Structure formats: structure tokens, C-alpha cells
């Protein structure tokens, strides 16, 4: 026996089996008013006659007239879930949504059956057991395709195009997606190239990059301006101070001989210091020389005046000496002596020298007169002479 004969025998067994042997596991597969509403229109429609198609197919191939009676309805369908899933997967209603809608419209199948069959479909990745029912579902699918092809030939060849669309739908979707992705990538690359080539975009980018940097530079410039103002004020004060110093240095240059020829402040200061040191040495040398020539320079004027007063009261002085050194009372009356000590201190240098020289010359004259006369004057004469005013 061939495969088709085995399939026909198995088909008969399935048809002749009672419904009670298959307990309804799924409540959707049991007899219901919804199924009863379209069972007669689906299976007993004139346009959807499986009996005639099966007879013609079997007669053409094996010359065996095996009638396929489809008198059973949806309620007589076995409640095996595996069989239902396999039949739904390999049925011609699973070829695609477009093909199913077209077949339903051409065969007059109501929309409820399409919904029912879509709900009963299983995912493509589920594993199915190989068995005789798979062969039956394959044959049913082939017959449905043949029917669709015959209908398309009778109508003008539209069915063949629909079948091709169903077969190439998956390939078309994948190719379209690839094309779209490729187009998107190309468009993005073109945009990038255009942006890179266009000078305006580059200018905008540079401007956008320069804006934050410009803000930072502005703040930096403000800080530099403030610091510059502070430095300017400080520099002005420094300039004024340096000008004053330069003026004083010029004054010192005028005082110090030979300092005009020197350039540079440091060298000029050295010259001034050397000149001051030389002056100090000269003053010390002169003071030492004066002390050697006149050892009694540091005498007190008051003690000297007291000594003069005591000497004027003594009888040993001659007439000339009394006139040279008058008493203190006479000096005070004539106004020669002033009680202001400050004026005396100013003239102390000249007075000291004059008095010392006069004292020494008078002493020398006194000694010479004593040697000539050899006699001392009387006290009365001296007093009389002192009373006489010139």
C-alpha cells in the first residue's frame, strides 16, 4: 500500500470513532451554540466541498474511488489537544493573515472561524510528535492549495499570485527591514558628511564651543582688570616715592663734590658715605690739634669770674692791672656784663681765647714792672687810684 492508501484508512478510522471516546479536555472544543451556528455553513457549503476534491485527486493518482464522507461536525472532532495544535499549525488557514482573509472571502467562510483558528494556533517553536496525523494534515494542506490554484485559474490567475505572496511574505518582510536599515544608515552617513563639509555647521559648532570659553575669558579679563587697577595705584605710589628719593639724591650730589660724575644710585651712595667719613676724620684731627695747642680750654666762666673778683680785691695788683680788670660791680654798672648766660655761652669761644691771651700778656708785663721798680705800691695809693675815674 502506498502512503495515500494508509492515510485514507486512518482517515476512515478517525471518522468512524465515536465522540465519547475523546473526553473534552478543552471546553472550547466541546459542542457549543457558537460552533453549531457555523458548522453547517462551513462543512456543507457548495463552494467548499472536500469530498469532490478528494475524489478527483485520488482518482487521478491511484484510480481508486475512495469516498471521503465529511458528515461529521465540529462536535464530533476529537478533543486531543496535540492533534488540534498540529492541525491548526499545518492547516491552510495558517499561511498568513492576507491569504486567510482572501480564502475566507472567496469561500464564504464567516469571520468567527478565522478567529477560532487563530486562537487555536500554537507557536512556531513548539515541538510536535511525528505520527500519522501529521501526514494527514500535510495532505489536507496540499489539497487546499490545489483548490486555491484551481479557483485562481478559473478567476484569471489571481490565486497563483496570492500563493506566491504567502510563501514570500516572510522573505519580503526580512528583506524590507534590511533595506530600511541600510537606507537609514546611508542617510545618517550622508547627513554626517554634509555636516562635515558644510562651513556653516562648522562655524556653528565653533561658536557653540567658544561661548563657554568666552564667558570664562570675560571673568578672567575682569579679574585681570581689577588686579591691573590695584597694580596701577601701587605703581603710582611707588613712582611718587621714587621721585622724592631721586630729588634728595640730587641734593646730596650737589653737596658732595665729585658726585655728579658718578652714575648709579649705589655708587653715588658709596661716594656720599665716603665723603661723610672723611669729614668726620678731619673734625677729629682738628679737635686733637686744638687740644694740644690750648690745654685749658675746658674752663668754667663762673669760676673764672670768681677768681677775677678775688684778684681785684688783693693789694698786690698795680694801677694798670686794676684798670685792665675792673671789679664786677663796675662791670655790671657799665653794662659790660650781662646776666644772660646763653649769650655768654655763644661768645665763649672768642672770649676764652682773648682772655687767656690778655691774661698771659698782663702777667708778663707785671713781672717786668716788678723787676724795674723793686718796690711794692702802697695800699692807700692803690685804693686812691682805684677811686679815681678816668
UniProtKB/Swiss-Prot annotation:
For this protein, the record's InterPro entries field holds:
bHLH_dom, bHLH_ZIP_TF, HLH_DNA-bd_sf
Q: Name one GO biological process term.
A: positive regulation of flower development
PROSITE patterns the record matches: BHLH (PS50888)
A GO cellular-component term linked to this record: nucleus
* Main localisation: nucleus
Task: Give its localization.
Answer: Nucleus
In which tissues does this protein get expressed? Expressed constitutively in roots, leaves, stems, and flowers.
Question: Any other comment in the entry?
Answer: Plants over-expressing CIB5 show increased hypocotyl and cotyledon lengths and increased flower size.
- Subunit structure and binding partners: Homodimer. Interacts with IBH1. Binds reversibly to CRY2 after blue light illumination.
Q: What is this protein called?
A: Transcription factor bHLH76
Q: Which organism is it from?
A: Arabidopsis thaliana
